Amino acid sequence: MKNRMKKLLVLATAATMMTAAFTGCGSSSDGADNNADTSADKSADEGTSNENLSGSLSLAGSTSMEKLCEALKESFMEKNPGVTVTVEYTGSGSGIESVTAGSVDIGDSSRALTDDEKANGVEENIVAIDGIAVITDKDNSVTELTSDDLKKIYTGEISNWKDLGGKDEAIVAIGREAASGTRGAFEELLDVKDQCKYAQELDSTGAVLAKVGSTPGAIGYVSLDVLDDTVTAMIIDGVEATEENIVAGKYLLSRPFVMATKGKIDEQNDIVKAWFDYVNSDEGQAVIKKVGLILPQ
């Protein structure tokens, strides 16, 4: 009898220990799952950080996208110290040619891709929306134009500010070089492609801003996010160039910022995928908004 009682006691003790062990394992598993979920959510919010990721990423193209690219480059490299990102600002057309040829990973374009470019296997990845501001020197008394006035200025039909209610002063029409995405978008939106008569064609957004700001009678166009107090942004068709008006579809001159790839993003190498993961993360989206651009809808 005593032996039987001892056996029962041993079995009961073993059962209790096994139950406790299984309970402990269950608690540990739940905690691990919760931690994993929290970690995944945090990673999605902040963008993927991978200290083991190493190599290089190359971008080339639009000068209008310099402010955006530099901000993304800096924050991405902080999160991925093993990756070196290089960006060359060669113009949208050149950037698309480079990514098509495979000489860079990403081609930056401040205009939509053409059907021919897409036919070559280039994927249009829109990362932001930008407005094109029409600018004049600070001393110009004309602050509003219709889109028709703007067309006539750039096609040479109107050549003096007095014809628009301003002082007797020649209009100096400043534009970008032929390969510029800003120029391509501006001329396409105004329906004046290959019709413009420029006094000067400059090779960067900054050069246009500086030239217009220092030249009496000058008019030009630049990316909305680079506007400063050295120039006046004109009202077009009664609408100011603001983020709110662009989102509402009221402002005529807006265009996409594209980071083009040869093929779809999921076909790219791990570093390119990580770049787009970051751009599309909450942290990356905050960078886009911080530099004055609009998130694509």
List where the protein language model places each region.
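Bacterial Sec-dependent N-terminal signal peptides
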Residues: 1-10
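Exported/periplasmic ABC-transporter solute-binding proteins
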Residues: 26-93, 97-101, 105-297
